Amino acid sequence: MAYLTRTAAALLATASALLTASPTASATPSPVLARESFDRLPLGPVTEGRDWTSDTSDGTLTVTPASTGHGRELRIRTEGNGRAFVVFPRLAPPGNSFWARMRLRVDAFPTAPDWAHWTLAEASGPDSPTLVRPLGGQYVPTEKRNFYGVGSDLGPTGDWTSWKTSAPAAAGKWSCVEFHLDAIDNRVTVYFDGVPQPDLTVSTDRHGGTADPFVFPTFDKLKLGWQLYQAGPSPSSYDVRMDDIALSTRRVGGCGS
């Protein structure tokens, strides 16, 4: 009887602990909105994965062995002014703010026509036509180089890319890129290999468009990939490699310093 009493007491104590334990740890939502390393996808052409689909025109997405020799990566290829994007269509970030991180390598940037404009990331939402392009750039003929810049289109501030000569776009080199979309002041910040790029920052009243305020839509979609907008570019085709995508309500890190 004493043994049964002790056993019953132990069971009651365990049950009490379970009932009174704070649910905070299990109830706290994960900061991660989406991840994709491509390691679990089959080699070859791909049109969708976990939490993402695709948007292509004169372009393809292909899972290939990683150039590092470990795992797999995504090869993005377009012809002319085609496009090929991984699309996260159900984003819904809390507070309309989020971080993104990815590794990417662009084999070659355009050298013609003058002012050729390209996009690597584009965020949008259903309540506004405004497209937010946190990662893109432009060929600047006066400098004979491509430069990164944050941009936008279709909204009150017009079509603009705020490229900066302090952010040259280097072809054939892997970079770890992060960007943060902060709805508090419609701020976009960019980091290369863990280093902030303050010259690329744009916000409500500091951007490259008209005098109107730059205002985010309510984000529900993010596209990552490549699009060049002008016809007849040189070179005539483009190859981009992308890997280790992470979208989160917090900075993911993993890019070095």
What are the residue ranges of the model-derived segments?
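Flexible glycan-contacting loops in extracellular carbohydrate-active proteins
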Residues: 201-240
